[in-house]
Amino acid sequence: MTMDRPPAPPPPSSDPRDARRHDPEADATSEPDSSRGGMEPPAEPQLLLNGAAKEAGRPSPGPPAAAVPVIELVRRGGSLDIKSREAAGEAMQRAPGAEPCRAAEAACEARMVQLSPPALPLQPPGRAMLYNLGQPLGTIGSGFFGEPDSFSMYGSNRVKRRPSPYEMEITDGPHTKVVRRIFTNSRERWRQQNVNGAFAELRKLIPTHPPDKKLSKNEILRLAMKYINFLAKLLNDQEEEGNQRGKVNKDSGIVQEDLLQDMLSPNSSCGSSLDGAASPDSFTEEHDTLDSKHARNLHHAILPVEGSAQR
Protein backbone atom coordinates (compact mmCIF):
# COMPACT_ATOMS: atom_id res chain seq x y z
CA MET A 1 0.00 0.00 0.00
CA THR A 2 1.59 3.24 -1.16
CA MET A 3 0.78 6.64 0.32
CA ASP A 4 0.92 9.79 -1.76
CA ARG A 5 3.19 12.42 -0.30
CA PRO A 6 1.92 15.97 -0.16
CA PRO A 7 3.73 18.42 -2.41
CA ALA A 8 6.72 20.10 -0.82
CA PRO A 9 6.23 23.74 0.15
CA PRO A 10 8.16 26.30 -1.93
CA PRO A 11 11.21 27.96 -0.42
CA PRO A 12 10.60 31.23 1.57
CA SER A 13 12.58 33.36 -0.85
CA SER A 14 10.37 32.45 -3.81
CA ASP A 15 7.59 34.72 -4.99
CA PRO A 16 4.17 33.89 -3.54
CA ARG A 17 2.74 34.13 -7.01
CA ASP A 18 5.03 31.24 -8.12
CA ALA A 19 4.00 29.24 -5.09
CA ARG A 20 0.39 29.86 -5.90
CA ARG A 21 1.11 28.75 -9.45
CA HIS A 22 2.33 25.29 -8.20
CA ASP A 23 -0.41 25.01 -5.61
CA PRO A 24 -3.08 22.51 -6.70
CA GLU A 25 -5.72 24.09 -4.51
CA ALA A 26 -5.15 27.41 -6.18
CA ASP A 27 -5.52 25.72 -9.55
CA ALA A 28 -8.74 24.16 -8.38
CA THR A 29 -10.11 27.50 -7.30
CA SER A 30 -9.01 29.15 -10.52
CA GLU A 31 -10.77 26.63 -12.74
CA PRO A 32 -14.25 28.07 -12.29
CA ASP A 33 -12.98 31.39 -13.67
CA SER A 34 -12.50 29.86 -17.07
CA SER A 35 -16.04 28.53 -17.01
CA ARG A 36 -17.54 32.01 -16.59
CA GLY A 37 -17.88 32.78 -20.22
CA GLY A 38 -14.26 33.90 -20.71
CA MET A 39 -14.55 37.10 -18.61
CA GLU A 40 -11.28 38.80 -17.63
CA PRO A 41 -10.65 39.42 -13.97
CA PRO A 42 -10.89 43.07 -12.84
CA ALA A 43 -7.77 45.19 -12.52
CA GLU A 44 -5.80 45.14 -9.32
CA PRO A 45 -6.80 47.90 -6.87
CA GLN A 46 -4.20 50.42 -5.80
CA LEU A 47 -3.71 52.09 -2.42
CA LEU A 48 -2.84 55.80 -2.03
CA LEU A 49 -0.46 56.35 0.89
CA ASN A 50 1.34 59.75 1.24
CA GLY A 51 0.85 60.60 -2.44
CA ALA A 52 2.43 57.31 -3.74
CA ALA A 53 0.42 54.58 -5.43
CA LYS A 54 1.17 51.02 -4.27
CA GLU A 55 -0.16 47.74 -5.56
CA ALA A 56 -1.99 45.53 -3.14
CA GLY A 57 -0.41 42.16 -2.54
CA ARG A 58 -3.26 40.37 -4.27
CA PRO A 59 -2.52 37.69 -6.85
CA SER A 60 -3.33 38.68 -10.40
CA PRO A 61 -5.22 35.58 -11.57
CA GLY A 62 -7.42 35.33 -8.48
CA PRO A 63 -10.73 37.27 -8.56
CA PRO A 64 -11.98 39.21 -5.50
CA ALA A 65 -14.06 37.48 -2.90
CA ALA A 66 -17.53 36.68 -4.13
CA ALA A 67 -19.24 37.85 -0.96
CA VAL A 68 -17.51 41.29 -0.90
CA PRO A 69 -17.78 43.31 -4.16
CA VAL A 70 -15.12 45.89 -4.95
CA ILE A 71 -17.63 48.72 -5.40
CA GLU A 72 -19.15 48.01 -2.01
CA LEU A 73 -15.74 48.17 -0.36
CA VAL A 74 -14.87 51.52 -1.88
CA ARG A 75 -18.18 53.02 -0.89
CA ARG A 76 -18.21 51.82 2.71
CA GLY A 77 -14.75 51.81 4.14
CA GLY A 78 -12.33 53.68 1.88
CA SER A 79 -8.78 52.66 1.01
CA LEU A 80 -7.80 51.40 4.46
CA ASP A 81 -10.81 49.05 4.71
CA ILE A 82 -10.08 47.73 1.25
CA LYS A 83 -6.55 46.83 2.26
CA SER A 84 -7.59 45.06 5.47
CA ARG A 85 -10.36 43.08 3.79
CA GLU A 86 -8.16 42.18 0.86
CA ALA A 87 -5.58 40.84 3.31
CA ALA A 88 -8.29 38.64 4.88
CA GLY A 89 -9.39 37.37 1.45
CA GLU A 90 -5.82 36.59 0.47
CA ALA A 91 -5.31 34.63 3.68
CA MET A 92 -8.24 32.41 2.70
CA GLN A 93 -6.99 31.90 -0.86
CA ARG A 94 -3.25 31.58 -0.11
CA ALA A 95 -1.55 28.28 0.62
CA PRO A 96 -0.26 27.62 4.12
CA GLY A 97 3.35 27.88 2.99
CA ALA A 98 2.97 31.43 1.64
CA GLU A 99 2.54 33.21 5.04
CA PRO A 100 6.26 33.95 5.64
CA CYS A 101 6.50 35.72 2.27
CA ARG A 102 3.43 37.82 3.12
CA ALA A 103 4.96 38.80 6.46
CA ALA A 104 8.18 39.92 4.75
CA GLU A 105 6.19 41.96 2.20
CA ALA A 106 4.16 43.62 4.98
CA ALA A 107 7.38 44.53 6.78
CA CYS A 108 8.73 46.15 3.58
CA GLU A 109 5.51 48.11 3.17
CA ALA A 110 5.68 49.34 6.77
CA ARG A 111 9.31 50.39 6.25
CA MET A 112 8.40 52.30 3.10
CA VAL A 113 5.54 54.02 4.91
CA GLN A 114 7.85 55.07 7.74
CA LEU A 115 10.50 56.42 5.35
CA SER A 116 8.06 58.83 3.67
CA PRO A 117 7.62 62.17 5.52
CA PRO A 118 4.30 62.68 7.29
CA ALA A 119 1.91 65.04 5.50
CA LEU A 120 0.77 67.98 7.59
CA PRO A 121 -2.84 69.10 7.17
CA LEU A 122 -3.40 72.57 5.74
CA GLN A 123 -4.60 75.00 8.38
CA PRO A 124 -5.75 78.60 8.16
CA PRO A 125 -3.19 81.29 9.06
CA GLY A 126 -4.80 82.14 12.37
CA ARG A 127 -4.83 78.54 13.60
CA ALA A 128 -1.28 77.99 12.33
CA MET A 129 -0.09 80.95 14.39
CA LEU A 130 -1.89 79.61 17.48
CA TYR A 131 -0.27 76.18 17.19
CA ASN A 132 3.21 77.57 16.31
CA LEU A 133 3.08 75.93 12.87
CA GLY A 134 3.50 79.18 10.95
CA GLN A 135 6.14 81.85 11.09
CA PRO A 136 7.18 82.89 14.64
CA LEU A 137 5.86 86.22 15.86
CA GLY A 138 9.36 87.49 16.61
CA THR A 139 10.33 87.42 12.94
CA ILE A 140 7.27 89.37 11.78
CA GLY A 141 8.05 93.04 11.25
CA SER A 142 5.53 94.48 13.70
CA GLY A 143 5.91 97.15 16.33
CA PHE A 144 4.45 95.07 19.17
CA PHE A 145 6.62 91.94 19.04
CA GLY A 146 10.34 91.41 18.86
CA GLU A 147 13.15 93.82 19.53
CA PRO A 148 12.63 97.51 18.65
CA ASP A 149 15.79 97.52 16.52
CA SER A 150 14.49 94.85 14.11
CA PHE A 151 11.64 96.85 12.62
CA SER A 152 11.30 96.21 8.92
CA MET A 153 8.28 98.40 8.26
CA TYR A 154 9.72 101.70 9.52
CA GLY A 155 13.40 102.10 8.77
CA SER A 156 15.64 104.52 10.62
CA ASN A 157 16.60 106.24 7.37
CA ARG A 158 13.05 107.31 6.59
CA VAL A 159 12.05 108.60 10.04
CA LYS A 160 13.57 112.00 10.88
CA ARG A 161 12.83 113.63 14.20
CA ARG A 162 13.71 117.19 15.13
CA PRO A 163 15.26 117.89 18.53
CA SER A 164 12.70 120.55 19.45
CA PRO A 165 9.20 119.24 20.29
CA TYR A 166 7.55 122.48 19.10
CA GLU A 167 8.88 122.33 15.54
CA MET A 168 6.85 120.45 12.97
CA GLU A 169 8.35 118.74 9.96
CA ILE A 170 6.75 120.03 6.75
CA THR A 171 7.11 118.06 3.55
CA ASP A 172 5.85 118.93 0.11
CA GLY A 173 2.66 116.99 -0.32
CA PRO A 174 -1.04 117.45 -0.97
CA HIS A 175 -1.77 118.12 2.70
CA THR A 176 0.90 120.84 2.85
CA LYS A 177 -0.47 122.52 -0.27
CA VAL A 178 -3.95 122.64 1.24
CA VAL A 179 -2.61 124.20 4.44
CA ARG A 180 -0.70 126.84 2.49
CA ARG A 181 -3.76 127.69 0.41
CA ILE A 182 -5.90 128.11 3.53
CA PHE A 183 -3.27 130.35 5.16
CA THR A 184 -2.99 132.53 2.02
CA ASN A 185 -6.76 132.92 1.75
CA SER A 186 -7.11 133.94 5.39
CA ARG A 187 -4.28 136.47 5.08
CA GLU A 188 -5.82 138.04 1.95
CA ARG A 189 -9.23 138.20 3.62
CA TRP A 190 -7.73 139.97 6.66
CA ARG A 191 -5.95 142.52 4.43
CA GLN A 192 -9.14 143.25 2.46
CA GLN A 193 -11.08 143.83 5.68
CA ASN A 194 -8.47 146.34 6.89
CA VAL A 195 -8.61 148.26 3.58
CA ASN A 196 -12.41 148.40 3.65
CA GLY A 197 -12.38 149.66 7.23
CA ALA A 198 -9.91 152.44 6.35
CA PHE A 199 -12.07 153.59 3.41
CA ALA A 200 -15.14 153.65 5.68
CA GLU A 201 -13.34 155.91 8.20
CA LEU A 202 -12.17 158.25 5.41
CA ARG A 203 -15.71 158.48 4.02
CA LYS A 204 -16.96 159.74 7.39
CA LEU A 205 -14.52 162.71 7.26
CA ILE A 206 -15.51 163.90 3.76
CA PRO A 207 -18.51 166.31 3.79
CA THR A 208 -21.07 165.71 1.05
CA HIS A 209 -24.46 167.28 0.41
CA PRO A 210 -26.37 164.09 1.16
CA PRO A 211 -24.45 162.90 4.19
CA ASP A 212 -25.23 159.24 3.44
CA LYS A 213 -24.31 159.39 -0.24
CA LYS A 214 -22.57 156.22 -1.37
CA LEU A 215 -19.22 156.74 -3.05
CA SER A 216 -16.82 154.37 -4.71
CA LYS A 217 -13.25 154.03 -3.53
CA ASN A 218 -11.96 156.19 -6.37
CA GLU A 219 -14.50 158.96 -5.61
CA ILE A 220 -13.61 158.80 -1.92
CA LEU A 221 -9.92 159.30 -2.74
CA ARG A 222 -10.60 162.22 -5.14
CA LEU A 223 -12.89 164.04 -2.73
CA ALA A 224 -10.39 163.48 0.06
CA MET A 225 -7.63 165.13 -2.01
CA LYS A 226 -9.85 168.11 -2.82
CA TYR A 227 -10.89 168.50 0.79
CA ILE A 228 -7.27 168.39 1.95
CA ASN A 229 -6.26 171.10 -0.57
CA PHE A 230 -9.19 173.29 0.51
CA LEU A 231 -8.21 173.02 4.17
CA ALA A 232 -4.57 173.87 3.38
CA LYS A 233 -5.61 176.99 1.42
CA LEU A 234 -7.92 178.08 4.22
CA LEU A 235 -5.10 177.83 6.74
CA ASN A 236 -2.83 179.96 4.53
CA ASP A 237 -5.50 182.65 4.17
CA GLN A 238 -6.02 182.75 7.92
CA GLU A 239 -2.30 183.18 8.50
CA GLU A 240 -2.10 186.07 6.02
CA GLU A 241 -5.08 187.79 7.61
CA GLY A 242 -3.55 187.41 11.03
CA ASN A 243 -0.31 188.97 9.85
CA GLN A 244 -2.16 191.98 8.40
CA ARG A 245 -4.07 192.49 11.63
CA GLY A 246 -0.85 192.42 13.55
CA LYS A 247 0.64 195.15 11.39
CA VAL A 248 -2.42 197.43 11.86
CA ASN A 249 -2.35 196.96 15.60
CA LYS A 250 1.34 197.78 15.63
CA ASP A 251 0.79 201.03 13.71
CA SER A 252 -2.01 202.14 16.01
CA GLY A 253 0.16 201.40 19.02
CA ILE A 254 2.93 203.65 17.65
CA VAL A 255 0.48 206.57 17.18
CA GLN A 256 -0.80 206.21 20.72
CA GLU A 257 2.74 206.23 22.09
CA ASP A 258 3.51 209.44 20.17
CA LEU A 259 0.47 211.12 21.64
CA LEU A 260 1.41 210.10 25.14
CA GLN A 261 4.93 211.42 24.68
CA ASP A 262 3.60 214.73 23.40
CA MET A 263 1.29 215.03 26.36
CA LEU A 264 3.99 214.18 28.88
CA SER A 265 6.67 216.48 27.38
CA PRO A 266 7.55 219.68 29.49
CA ASN A 267 6.91 222.02 26.55
CA SER A 268 3.36 220.87 26.17
CA SER A 269 0.41 222.66 27.73
CA CYS A 270 -0.39 219.61 29.82
CA GLY A 271 3.02 219.80 31.53
CA SER A 272 2.71 223.51 32.22
CA SER A 273 -0.77 223.06 33.56
CA LEU A 274 0.49 220.42 35.94
CA ASP A 275 3.11 222.83 37.29
CA GLY A 276 0.86 225.87 37.75
CA ALA A 277 -2.49 227.27 36.80
CA ALA A 278 -3.51 226.98 33.24
CA SER A 279 -3.34 230.13 31.19
CA PRO A 280 -6.04 230.97 28.65
CA ASP A 281 -3.40 231.29 25.93
CA SER A 282 -2.27 227.73 26.30
CA PHE A 283 -5.84 226.53 26.20
CA THR A 284 -6.51 228.39 22.97
CA GLU A 285 -3.32 227.01 21.42
CA GLU A 286 -4.25 223.47 22.25
CA HIS A 287 -7.73 223.98 20.97
CA ASP A 288 -6.38 225.32 17.69
CA THR A 289 -4.08 222.35 17.24
CA LEU A 290 -6.90 219.87 17.93
CA ASP A 291 -9.16 221.66 15.47
CA SER A 292 -6.50 221.61 12.79
CA LYS A 293 -5.89 217.82 13.28
CA HIS A 294 -9.59 217.11 13.20
CA ALA A 295 -10.05 219.13 10.00
CA ARG A 296 -7.10 217.33 8.40
CA ASN A 297 -8.63 213.92 9.19
CA LEU A 298 -11.96 214.94 7.78
CA HIS A 299 -10.29 216.19 4.60
CA HIS A 300 -8.61 212.78 4.06
CA ALA A 301 -11.89 210.95 4.63
CA ILE A 302 -13.87 213.10 2.18
CA LEU A 303 -11.40 212.77 -0.70
CA PRO A 304 -12.14 209.06 -1.51
CA VAL A 305 -15.88 209.70 -1.50
CA GLU A 306 -15.55 212.59 -3.95
CA GLY A 307 -13.29 210.54 -6.21
CA SER A 308 -15.84 207.75 -6.35
CA ALA A 309 -18.60 210.24 -7.16
CA GLN A 310 -16.58 211.72 -10.01
CA ARG A 311 -16.07 208.29 -11.50
Swiss-Prot record:
Residues 1-14 have a biased composition (Pro residues). Phosphorylated on serine residues. The keyword Transcription regulation applies. Residues 1-67, 265-311 are annotated as: Disordered. Pfam families: HLH. Residues 179-231 form the bHLH domain. The keyword S-adenosyl-L-methionine does not apply. CDD domains: bHLH_TS_TAL1. Implicated in the genesis of hemopoietic malignancies. It may play an important role in hemopoietic differentiation. One of its GO terms (molecular function) is DNA-binding transcription factor activity, RNA polymerase II-specific. InterPro entries: bHLH_dom (IPR011598), HLH_DNA-bd_sf (IPR036638), TAL-like (IPR040238). It comes from Gallus gallus. Its main location: nucleus. One of its GO terms (biological process) is cell differentiation. It comes from the Eukaryota. Residues 15-25, 284-294 have a biased composition (Basic and acidic residues). GO terms for cellular component: nucleus. This is T-cell acute lymphocytic leukemia protein 1 homolog. Keywords: Developmental protein, Differentiation, DNA-binding, Nucleus, Phosphoprotein, Transcription, Transcription regulation. It is found in: Nucleus. PROSITE patterns: BHLH (PS50888). Efficient DNA binding requires dimerization with another bHLH protein. Forms heterodimers with TCF3.
